Amino acid sequence: MRWLLFAMSVAWLGCGGEDPSQITYDEWAERAATVQCSHEARCEGSSLDEAACMAQVLERYRQVEPELEDATGARTGCVRCMRIRTEVLTASLDSECQQPVATSRIDAACGADQQACAGAP
């Protein structure tokens, strides 16, 4: 009986949450900007207001979106980059900035010069 309860709880947990492939480019940009600006303010000591930071980052993602749409698979690559960046920075924030940012993971997904998102942060 315990095994059945365990299996049901695991299945229930597996069914929850969002499917990352169903989240739009704009939603990923919003998430990435939120986490990036929070991380900069809390972990890096940025003096830039989080709202101003958000506006700048979102504007940059909006500027590159048409360029990404023109190249086959580019938009998907940028969304993957935003997802990985969000995961990495969230892990750092969750540890109260004690966990170092896995820049190698971000670079692997985004490129060292942020090529995956056409230079957007």
What are these regions (language model features)?
Residues 1-121:
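Signals and flexible motifs at protein termini associated with secretion
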